[in-house]
């Protein structure tokens, strides 16, 4: 079996031959990998376009990541900036725009190994929060990189709690300017990407003060560096925050402002305006100014959050069919480590999660596009549900993708600790997503507030609006309670309706429990804030169950749309079953708590779960192949399509500069140390 034509090889000595163990995995296909790739891409035409973009990117030496693992922080920054420069030139020449998919595919091909990514977030926030006049002025400048912009929200002393941001924007009616000021050291903007060395402008989130009144957080466009010589502008203290756990190519920065003045027109004014005399006009809800962050959060899901787990699964699964270790019987040869049930237990839940989260994120993106159009027209009906879905999905996906990528790394043993495996950089990059665009615990608790309100509405509590129908994502809260799981055999747990209902039951019970505890504290005399703080652990548990239920439900609904693809539907159903059952077994206490599941039924679920592992094993390589990552995109000695792990790992190690550079420590320390011992012999 040869390597498919669309796969751009690394061009090394091993790319032209397939490892026999890898070839055997692809010999008998139970489904069309190409067709599954098309489904994941949203159609064959999108697959073709993506591969065309990838061939352009990988055919250009300016985009090579060959020596990334041996580079210093400065070298990584320069390489990432070089790639952005050449990508922008290609985009201009080819006519690629944000309205098309080419730039999205280019980012995927480059594994987001680029600088100036915050330009896209700036533009999304501008379109969400800016007036038509502001968009007309600033969007062309951003699209063509006449300015380089970042999104500066997080401060040294505040992150997810936006109401606590300290940066102030005080309106001066005499000059019709806003005075942007960092009143304390903790008000210093801290962490924005591209701010440290690159940005010329920043979209600043600050507390608006006009006519002596505080009006909450609003967005302002603030120039920070000269467009002539890139020096900081007056009143601006700016720089790089220093080394980080990962993402070393990005210049995360700090920004302190000392009474910096910007024109009145620099406050984004789709949902709020300050008139020349200082009068404040509110055009949206209190949540409107969070829209820019919501837009960013939704668009991160498939790329920055899910993609690292998908890549980690590809690398670890491919390595697991090449690595032979231990015998199943004393007289047998060593087997592929993927034959071990424990290795399957490590990897297959992560693989199932990749597919579950893909369908969850694409479904959310569809809902977002519908709701976003309404919001821009100042119809905020869908905003609460969209906010809850986006925050919960981001929190759950980033939590599980981080845990899953680390699980894949550990499943590769010692080689997974090598940067050359590609796994450490995947782990550190996705770990960052647990805190950027909202710390996950805080996000879960925002979901919990939505659940409490929805539960009160469903049950007709005083003060609720029970006459209105519940949002679709929480409609299960109004369904009749299913007191007991009807499963009688292990095979019953292969029924999507059964395990989806089980997850709905647990999510509803935990939500009702959280409401009960909250109300009990209120009735005992606690005020609403104290009562909330004393029940946040229970609320957190309910929010997590709700989010997992949504992921199971969305996977089930995606399967129902694949009736014309029976082979693919069958193999994906196994992953859906595994995803649901893995969650049940991991959280079995929640299902046993009220007797919904019996101990015997948990045993049945475990039997069903273990029966799935050998079935998924047969298709594991094919299911990871369907993600269709090129070898350049993976940049892993362990995860190449051809499976030649050991040859490539040995060859890549030879490229380490330390193997050819003189070792100054030898003459300074090692030689004297050896000589001191020799003199005593």
UniProtKB/Swiss-Prot annotation:
GO BP of this protein: bile acid biosynthetic process; fatty acid beta-oxidation using acyl-CoA oxidase; lipid homeostasis; very long-chain fatty acid metabolic process
Catalytic activity: (25R)-3alpha,7alpha,12alpha-trihydroxy-5beta-cholestan-26-oyl-CoA + A + H2O = (24R,25R)-3alpha,7alpha,12alpha,24-tetrahydroxy-5beta-cholestan-26-oyl-CoA + AH2; (25S)-3alpha,7alpha,12alpha-trihydroxy-5beta-cholestan-26-oyl-CoA + O2 = (24E)-3alpha,7alpha,12alpha-trihydroxy-5beta-cholest-24-en-26-oyl-CoA + H2O2
Transmembrane segments: none
Sequence motif Microbody targeting signal, residues: 679-681
Residues modified as Phosphoserine: 9
GO cellular component: peroxisome
Annotated GO MF terms: 3alpha,7alpha,12alpha-trihydroxy-5beta-cholestanoyl-CoA 24-hydroxylase activity; FAD binding; fatty acid binding; flavin adenine dinucleotide binding; palmitoyl-CoA oxidase activity; protein homodimerization activity
Taxonomy, superkingdom: Eukaryota
Known tissue expression: Liver and kidney.
SUPFAM superfamilies: Acyl-CoA dehydrogenase C-terminal domain-like (SSF47203), Acyl-CoA dehydrogenase NM domain-like (SSF56645)
Cofactor list: FAD
InterPro entries associated with the record: ACOX_C_alpha1, Acyl-CoA_ox_N, Acyl-CoA_Oxase/DH_mid-dom_sf, Acyl-CoA_oxidase, Acyl-CoA_oxidase_C, AcylCo_DH-like_C, AcylCoA_DH/ox_N_sf, AcylCoA_DH/oxidase_NM_dom_sf
Compartment annotation: Peroxisome
Principal location: other
Residues making up the signal peptide according to the UniProt record: none
Key words of the record: FAD, Fatty acid metabolism, Flavoprotein, Lipid metabolism, Oxidoreductase, Peroxisome, Phosphoprotein
Enzyme Commission numbers on file: 1.17.99.3
Family: Belongs to the acyl-CoA oxidase family.
Function in brief: Oxidizes the CoA esters of the bile acid intermediates di- and tri-hydroxycholestanoic acids. Capable of oxidizing short as well as long chain 2-methyl branched fatty acids.
Quaternary assembly: Homodimer.
Name under which the protein is recorded: Peroxisomal acyl-coenzyme A oxidase 2
């Amino acid at each position: 079996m040869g390597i498919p034509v669309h796969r751009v090889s690394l061009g090394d000595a091993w790319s032209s031959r397939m490892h026999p163990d890898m070839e055997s995995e692809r010999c008998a296909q139970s489904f069309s990998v190409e067709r599954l790739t098309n489904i994941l891409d949203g159609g064959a035409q999108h697959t073709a376009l993506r591969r065309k973009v990838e061939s352009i990117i990988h055919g250009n030496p300016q985009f090579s990541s060959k020596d990334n693992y041996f580079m210093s922080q400065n070298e990584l920054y320069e390489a990432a900036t070089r790639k952005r420069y050449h990508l922008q030139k290609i985009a201009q020449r080819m006519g690629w725009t944000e309205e098309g998919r080419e730039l999205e595919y280019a980012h995927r091909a480059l594994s987001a190994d680029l600088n100036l990514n915050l330009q896209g977030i700036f533009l999304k926030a501008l379109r969400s929060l800016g007036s038509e006049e502001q968009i007309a002025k600033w969007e062309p400048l951003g699209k063509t990189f006449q300015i380089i912009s970042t999104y500066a929200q997080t401060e040294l002393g505040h992150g997810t709690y936006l109401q606590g941001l300290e940066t102030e924007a005080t309106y001066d009616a005499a000059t019709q300017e806003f005075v942007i000021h960092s009143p304390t050291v903790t008000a210093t903007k801290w962490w924005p990407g591209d701010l440290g060395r690159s940005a010329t402008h920043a979209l600043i989130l600050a507390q608006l003060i006009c006519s002596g009144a505080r009006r909450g957080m609003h967005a302002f466009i603030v120039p920070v560096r000269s467009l002539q010589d890139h020096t900081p502008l007056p009143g601006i203290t700016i720089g790089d925050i220093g080394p980080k756990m990962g993402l070393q190519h990005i210049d995360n920065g700090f920004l302190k402002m000392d009474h910096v003045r910007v024109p009145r027109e620099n406050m984004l004014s789709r949902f709020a305006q300050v008139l020349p005399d200082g009068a404040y006009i509110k055009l949206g809800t209190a949540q409107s100014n969070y829209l820019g962050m919501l837009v960013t959060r939704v668009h991160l899901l498939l790329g920055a959050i899910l993609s690292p787990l998908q890549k980690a699964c590809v690398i670890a699964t491919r390595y697991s069919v090449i690595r032979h270790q231990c015998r199943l019987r004393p007289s047998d040869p060593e087997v592929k480590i993927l034959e071990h049930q424990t290795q399957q237990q490590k990897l297959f839940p992560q693989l199932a999660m990749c597919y579950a989260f893909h369908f969850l994120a694409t479904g959310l993106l569809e809902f977002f596009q519908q709701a976003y159009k309404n919001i821009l027209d100042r119809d905020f009906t869908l905003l609460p549900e969209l906010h809850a879905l986006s925050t919960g999905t981001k929190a759950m996906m980033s939590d599980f993708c981080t845990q899953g990528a680390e699980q894949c790394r550990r499943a590769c043993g010692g080689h997974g600790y090598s940067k050359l495996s590609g796994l450490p950089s995947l782990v550190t990059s996705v770990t960052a997503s647990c805190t950027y665009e909202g710390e996950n615990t805080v996000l879960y608790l925002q979901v919990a507030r939505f659940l409490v309100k929805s539960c009160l509405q469903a049950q007709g509590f005083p003060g609720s609006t029970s006459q209105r129908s519940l949002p679709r994502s929480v409609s299960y809260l109004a369904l009749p309670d299913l007191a007991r799981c009807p499963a009688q055999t292990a095979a019953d747990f292969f029924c999507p309706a059964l395990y989806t209902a089980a997850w709905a039951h647990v999510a509803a019970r935990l939500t009702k429990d959280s409401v009960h505890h909250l109300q009990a504290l209120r009735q005992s005399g606690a005020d609403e804030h104290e009562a909330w703080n004393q029940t946040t652990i229970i609320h957190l548990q309910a929010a997590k169950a709700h989010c997992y239920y949504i992921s199971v439900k969305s996977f089930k609904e995606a399967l129902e749309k694949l009736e014309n693809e029976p082979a693919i539907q069958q193999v994906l159903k196994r992953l859906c079953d595994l995803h649901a059952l893995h969650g049940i077994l991991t959280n079995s206490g929640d299902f046993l708590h009220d007797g919904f599941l019996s101990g015997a039924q948990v045993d049945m679920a475990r039997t069903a779960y273990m029966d799935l592992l050998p079935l998924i094993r047969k298709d594991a390589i094919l299911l990871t192949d369907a993600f269709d990552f090129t070898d350049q995109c993976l940049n892993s000695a362990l995860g190449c399509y051809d499976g030649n792990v050991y040859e490539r790992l040995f060859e890549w190690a030879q490229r380490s500069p330390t193997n050819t550079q003189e070792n100054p420590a030898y003459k300074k320390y090692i030689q004297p140390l050896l000589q001191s011992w020799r003199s005593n012999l």
